[in-house]
Amino acid sequence: SGNGSLIKKGQGDMTLDGINSYQGITRIDQGNLRINSDQSLGGGNKNNSDLIMNGGGLKIFGSFASDRDVYFNADGDISVDKDMSSSWNKIHTGDYKFTKSGEGELIVRNGGDASEISLMNGALTLINLNMNSEKQDALLNVNNGVLNIIGGDVSAKNDLIYITGDSTINLDNVSIKSSGNGMRLSDNVQSTLSLRNQYTDMPILVEGKNSILNINAGDNTTLASNMHKSDESTINLNLMNNSSNWVISQRTDVDNVRNSGNIIFSPLNKSEFNNLNIKGDYSGGNGTITLNTVLNKGGDKDQQLSDKVLIKGNVSGETVLKVVPQGNGDNTASAPGNIFSSRDGISLVQVGGDAADNAFKLDREYISTGTKSPYQYRLFTYRGDQVDQQSNFLGDKPVNVDFRLQTAYLDSSGNVVPGVDPDYNNSNNENGNGTGNDNGTGNGNGTGNGTGNGTGNGTGNGNTGERKSRPLIVRQASSYLSLPAALSNYSNFVLDNIDRRLGDIYSKNNNKQIKDFDFYYRFITSSDSYKSNLDLDNYGYDFKQKNNAMSIGTNWTAFDYGNNKVFLGANYTFGDSRTNVTNSSQESSYMVVNANTFSLTGTLINVNDYYIDGVLSYGLYNGHIYNNREKISRVKADSFDLSIEFGKRFDLVNSLEIEPQ
């Protein structure tokens, strides 16, 4: 009791198991001080009752929480007995080594600083501790036990964590910097590294013989570590969920992988591609793999420019491949006649053991180069005798299943294949068809409605003879090839409506109802279909088109010109055109175009019932092309149209009229 301090000297052990009330510090110079509660160290307040390790050790044989800080003025050891747990406020080791021993748990709740820590046994939990080492030795030496690091900053000039015994390392939201290895394992060690809320790019080295490192990447984790292992050691990786990421920036060798997260090959550095080599088995838990790939002809090994996943064992489950495309694209069917071959294209995944056909699949229907090439690259699977062993990237083990990107073709049954089917020789005769025009009616002086339905008739016969397989092109291309006909049909749809309106002027003039100034508006619609005179093998696409528009116009002036009456006006029509390419399930697309048409109109009516109608129009078109799921391309176009119509109306009996044009 009193205001003094307790100083432990001598090599023996001293035990404090009661309640002490001294107010000063506790300092251990030599030997060991044994305690079973925080009250054993006196009753001083937090500011003047710290524990100072001055060369001796602290042995804890009870469970308790202390608000004291622990200072090290020399190397020191804190031991916690089995089944006991002791927590402290902060530790400050300076340049000295702090050793945790005993089978119990020691917790540092509120950080502090340390330069070298050794875990001999039991569990050590460090929360918000700043650890920095300029020493040649590792910052954290783990012989046995469980090391939990939560928050804080950890940096080391040399190795960060050196593991010499069976242990578990748990990292949660720790800032890590290491000039050496982030983690290094010695011989005959089995260790588990678990990560949560963690980004780490520390190198991992498993150099010892018969050592095993199991890595569990959990919630909100990105593992960007380069991994290196000896032939006698094992690294097993488990990406536990879809917020678990593994970034690969160089060739990486591991033994077994379970992927319920995301494996990401980092963007190319100087056009260098990387391999993930898996010595054992791979299990896909609906995870993803992102690879960088040059879309080219492929074929020869040195032309298959892509990151690769190479698995010597078996594959289970399913995995989605996300290909980041580069290059200008090319037709991978390089054999004479474009006959498909297992050597063509670009290998992404090779398996030495067994794998189902759907073990790997693309995240989309096909891969393309965007605007650089029209080809569809799809993923095809080869197995057993189908595999071209000249494309073997597994080394000494034959490839049993090969997943390759190749140019997609259609065979005689409509199936997607990676080249020309030699049996694809059935003939076809088709009649071609052309564009259709809508027919509609409108009524009213100033308002009106128009509706129409049209079916186009072609101008010639389709190709005859042998059908030939051909490459599939990207879906937006079918809309691009249909776009001129679709926009022409929409333009005719607008002009036809304006021409009908100009015809109203002539009718009103004959009935003496015409006005020098007249305003009108009407809603118009049409449904049309188009059938190409080319067959599908020659990229002939059929489509259905739905047009809707609002037409607003005026005749702003009229004047006499000799024996003629002249009317001048303007029209603005806005609407949309929806076009659905229908005759190719593998290349179908849907196009929505918003249109704005500005027109100047003129009508000349002769006293002898002759008339001339003229329309000069400018159209602006903006829209998008869709596949089954999303927007895939944009449409932007414009047009100029000139329409001149000459006619005369003849009156027949019983109020019948005939009007040649």
Where are these regions (language model features)?
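Interface/linker segment at the passenger-translocator junction
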Residues: 336-352, 359-542
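Extracellular repeat-rich scaffold modules on cell surfaces
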Residues: 1-46, 74-131, 179, 184-187, ...
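Short glycine/serine/proline-enriched coil/turn segments at secondary-structure junctions
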Residues: 43, 298-301, 562, 653-654
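Extracellular beta-solenoid/beta-roll
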Residues: 3, 53-62, 68, 73, ...
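Outer membrane beta-barrel translocator domains of Type V secretion systems
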Residues: 423-424, 428, 458-658
